Design a protein with these regions (language model features):
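Extracellular glycan-modifying ectodomains
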Residues: 18-255
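Hydrophobic alpha-helical signal peptides and transmembrane signal-/tail-anchor segments
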Residues: 1-17
């Protein structure tokens, strides 16, 4: 019995440390939280616990995070975290975030108070703190080191929640954004596979659908009930069915 337990422990350790790695690419803490819930989070990467968008992740990787790490690019903002679905607002909480204004080309976006609307916002660390700055340096170095390996890699991204009308109006742009990012990232490292989730607040008889399946990435639509909140880690409100659906999908991929 003891030997069986030891064997399973060693097997699991080898599995999560040498067979594949899972990277959180945003757009907020939900992706890192799910990796953690699956006991697959063995180390930290730079986009684990902040607000980030795919175009900014591309620029960070391309520039070796020079604009990310420049503390002069940040301002402190009192922000409000909320969901906006088909023009219906759901308040989550108030936060204090470091907003990277280098990436905010629209002055109206800089003046925005919506936490999840920013291109890059740090709401759980402070780059002016030396320990936090060193933390991000380690995360960045670790990401590039991982890119140099042949190990199987997965990246996980959750698109900000939207209403069904928002989705229908923006569907093609979202799919193009996902595809463009994947085309970029597969040129930066070997053996990487993307997993995208689009969250839609819309009551359906089905919990989710696989919107697209390819050799390089999958896209899933997760249908969320009226009391679901896209906030916290991984979600808030009445989120238990949706959480289990995501875990089930990820387990089928990873395990």
């Amino acid at each position: 019995m003891i030997y069986d337990i030891v064997f399973l422990f060693v097997f699991y350790f080898i599995l999560i440390n040498y067979m594949y790695k899972v990277i959180s690419f945003g757009h907020r803490c939900s992706s890192a939280s799910f990796i953690q819930n699956l006991n697959l989070k063995t180390e930290s990467y730079p986009f684990d616990w902040l607000v980030s968008k795919l175009d900014i992740i591309k620029d960070c990787i391309e520039t070796r995070f020079v604009h990310f790490l420049n503390v002069n690019n940040y301002i402190i903002q009192n922000t409000e975290s909320f969901n906006m679905t088909d023009n219906v607002k759901t308040h989550i909480c108030n936060e204090i975030a470091q907003v990277n204004i280098y990436y905010e080309t629209d002055i109206q976006n800089i003046q925005s108070i919506q936490t999840y609307h920013y291109k890059l916002a740090i709401n759980h660390h402070n780059l002016n703190n030396d320990n936090d700055y060193q933390y991000y340096q380690r995360c960045i170095n670790r990401l590039y080191e991982l890119f140099e390996t042949d190990i199987q890699k997965y990246y996980l991204y959750f698109h900000p929640i939207m209403g069904i009308n928002d989705f229908q109006n923006n569907k093609e742009n979202i799919l193009n954004e996902f595809d463009n990012f994947n085309q970029y990232i597969i040129e930066k490292t070997k053996n990487i596979f993307g997993i995208y989730f689009i969250l839609i607040k819309h009551n359906e008889n089905i919990k989710s659908i696989k919107l697209k399946e390819s050799q390089k990435y999958n896209i899933f639509v997760l249908y969320c009930n009226d009391n679901f909140v896209d906030g916290g880690g991984p979600f808030m409100g009445n989120h238990y069915i949706e959480k289990e659906e995501v875990l089930s999908i990820l387990k089928n991929i990873f395990i």
